[in-house]
Amino acid sequence: MTTLACQKLAPHPESPRHQHAGPWLVWLHGLLGSGQDWLPVAQLCGDYPSLLIDLPGHGQSVSLSADGFADISRQLSQTLQANGIREYWLAGYSLGGRIAIYHACYGRHHGLQGLLVEGGNLGLENAELRQARLQQDRQWAQRFRQEPLPQVLDDWYQQAVFADLDPQQREQLVLLRADNHGPAVAEMLEATSLGHQPWLLPALQRLNVPYTYLCGDRDHKFLQLAQQYRLPLHTLARAGHNAHRANPGAFAAQVLAFLSQSSCLPPSSLSR
């Protein structure tokens, strides 16, 4: 059994859930991140217990690897089982969002109450696009393996999806992410390339649990994606691709509103 490194956060002492085991919030970070990225939001959602997970190749799971989405989904299930988590809401950002969708659609997700995705890509619809993305990700992976990490990160954060960042914010992210292990990042990047990811929209539309899609109002790529596929979109003000970092208070408020609304819905009303 492979279990991922994680940190548990108990509910606030005054929370009605403090003495009673209720659904957990399980948080999955993006590429180059760690479970700690979610700490400000998780603390603001302190009425719920939280599990902050380090994905393979990241944080305290740096020595772990994964052989694609199905393997990561299995590792997630085993981690939840090892931590005694029977009911949970699953939240993921970017790469973590893609893993969360896959797990909800295809994994062993007994106990899943609902899904929150921030800026997660649903996949690519044809083989030509998938092959092109594989080549692109392999080139990035080669750089992560061979070049000094700060040098690669300088270019990584120049990608169009990070266009909302100013030079100071880019510099802060490069410094923050420079403690990653380049070869481990490369392995995870290749294992979870969009070129390997199935097209998730049809399965997502068939989910029998509620889900929502969160996106910064400056994240034009994923705003367009959510609108194109008519996802249940909620936007975060003054935020780009990493909305939970830019505006944790507004993000936490959206999470809590979704949980409150979804928990009140009868099973027949789980429309998305």
From Swiss-Prot:
GO terms for MF: 2-succinyl-6-hydroxy-2,4-cyclohexadiene-1-carboxylate synthase activity
Record flagged with keyword Nucleotide-binding: no
Gene3D superfamilies: alpha/beta hydrolase
Annotated catalysed reactions: 5-enolpyruvoyl-6-hydroxy-2-succinyl-cyclohex-3-ene-1-carboxylate = (1R,6R)-6-hydroxy-2-succinyl-cyclohexa-2,4-diene-1-carboxylate + pyruvate
EC code(s) of this entry: 4.2.99.20
GO biological process: menaquinone biosynthetic process
Keywords: Lyase, Menaquinone biosynthesis
Domain of life: Bacteria
Keyword Flavoprotein: no
Pathway the protein acts in: Quinol/quinone metabolism; 1,4-dihydroxy-2-naphthoate biosynthesis; 1,4-dihydroxy-2-naphthoate from chorismate: step 3/7; Quinol/quinone metabolism; menaquinone biosynthesis
Complexes and interactors: Monomer.
Annotated function: Catalyzes a proton abstraction reaction that results in 2,5-elimination of pyruvate from 2-succinyl-5-enolpyruvyl-6-hydroxy-3-cyclohexene-1-carboxylate (SEPHCHC) and the formation of 2-succinyl-6-hydroxy-2,4-cyclohexadiene-1-carboxylate (SHCHC).
Family: Belongs to the AB hydrolase superfamily. MenH family.
UniProt xrefs under PANTHER family: 2-SUCCINYL-5-ENOLPYRUVYL-6-HYDROXY-3-CYCLOHEXENE-1-CARBOXYLATE SYNTHASE, PROTEIN PHYLLO, CHLOROPLASTIC
Name under which the protein is recorded: 2-succinyl-6-hydroxy-2,4-cyclohexadiene-1-carboxylate synthase
Lineage of the organism: Bacteria, Pseudomonadati, Pseudomonadota, Gammaproteobacteria, Enterobacterales
